[in-house]
């Protein structure tokens, strides 16, 4: 529209506000922690709310890769925490809607499994640290490593033999 907000997003929230009054409406984003991109998302959410549309939460699809440092980089983790703070300050919930951490090595190296563990743990630590200021939730993209278009790459908490990986133990320790 003239305000630079994608019309399909505005229309989606108009329809949802009209026909789903009892359903939680979450703006769900698939991307990393790039400040410029998130600036635009936050502007879009404020625009929707200022237009009288209900937005109940922000979701982040955390599809991480071992070659990225997002879940290990203090600056990016601090930015992630600030997003949760902003969300709560604006009366919304924050959801990690789909987390996975893809390792491409076959079989995965122990160092990669340790980075995967740290990534899951770091994200959950931040969520837990923000639980008293508003709703935070955590969901995984899947549980068991297995071949498939969206499941390959040793990305989940259990191996193909249903044995917990180090990341599962890291989550338990973190909680």
Region spans (language model):
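Conserved, mostly hydrophobic/aromatic
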Residues: 16, 58, 138, 171
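Substrate-binding cleft of secreted/luminal carbohydrate-active enzymes
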Residues: 97-99, 114-160, 168
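Active-site cleft segment of glycoside hydrolase catalytic domains centered on the general acid/base Glu
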Residues: 1-43, 68-82, 107-115, 148-164
């Amino acid at each position: 529209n003239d305000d630079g907000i994608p019309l399909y997003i505005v229309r989606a929230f108009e329809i949802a506000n009209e026909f789903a009054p009892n359903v939680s409406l979450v703006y769900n984003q698939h991307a990393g922690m790039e400040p410029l991109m998130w600036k635009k998302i936050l502007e879009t959410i404020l625009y929707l709310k200022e237009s009288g549309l209900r937005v109940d939460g922000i979701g982040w699809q955390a599809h991480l890769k071992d070659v990225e440092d997002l879940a290990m980089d203090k600056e990016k983790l601090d930015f992630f925490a600030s997003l949760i703070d902003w969300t709560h300050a604006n009366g919304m919930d924050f959801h990690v809607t789909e987390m996975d951490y893809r390792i491409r090595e076959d079989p995965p190296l122990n160092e990669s499994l340790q980075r995967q563990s740290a990534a899951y743990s770091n994200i959950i630590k931040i969520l837990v640290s923000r639980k008293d200021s508003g709703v935070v939730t955590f969901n995984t993209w899947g549980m068991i490593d297995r071949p498939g278009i969206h499941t390959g790459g040793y990305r989940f908490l259990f191996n193909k033999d249903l044995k917990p990986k180090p990341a599962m133990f890291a989550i338990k320790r973190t909680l």
